[in-house]
Amino acid sequence: ANLISLSNRSLLNINEMITVESYKLELNDLYRLYQFVLLNKRTTILEFGSGFSSLIFSQALKENKNKYKNDVKKLRRNNPFELFIVENEKRFLNITKRRIAKFRSKQDTKKNKNKKSEVKINFLFSECVMTNYRGNYATEYKKLPSCNPDFIYLDGPDQFKIKNKINNFTTSHKDMMP
């Protein structure tokens, strides 16, 4: 870039933040999550927040189901090979639902149409609010699924989508950005 174009560029003010509508796809992170679920033989996943990781988890659980479904029958597991997704933004929950449905329909046309090998995915919308936990400010989802996961993935909520304030404190303030 030349000097003139650099000088015409508007800079952010000190307290200004760049907000992004969608997040960058991190293939290395997704692969690491996929491998973790496979290598550790996870059967029930609780995911806070949704996205491409939801699709990756569903595929890893499907692979584990195909390999270990007979072994898991011997365990005390009420939700084997289920993915529970808790999301506080309906928009992202719907995007994830469509993405998984589209992927599954493409898989069905390519391979067999055996629905028994698919894992059950439970989508739950829940508001997220500020709360006081043992004298500390925290955020909590108002609704949680009834499950006993062997893997919990925390990828939400967006700190700017938290409802309520405690003593006028909220994580939604830009200065609270980690």
Outline where the language-model segments fall.
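Residues at the starts of beta-strands that form the adenosine-phosphate
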Residues: 44, 80-82
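Local beta-strand N-terminus motif with an aromatic residue
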Residues: 42, 148-150
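Conserved class I S-adenosyl-L-methionine
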Residues: 42-51
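C-terminal substrate-binding/active-site "lid" region of AdoMet-derived donor-dependent transferases
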Residues: 128, 133, 151, 157-178
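Conserved SAM-binding loop of SAM-dependent methyltransferases across substrates and taxa
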Residues: 52-71
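S-adenosyl-L-methionine
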Residues: 94-147
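Conserved acidic E/D residue at the C-terminus of a beta-strand in Rossmann-like folds
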Residues: 84-89
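Class I SAM-dependent methyltransferase Rossmann-like catalytic core
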Residues: 7-40
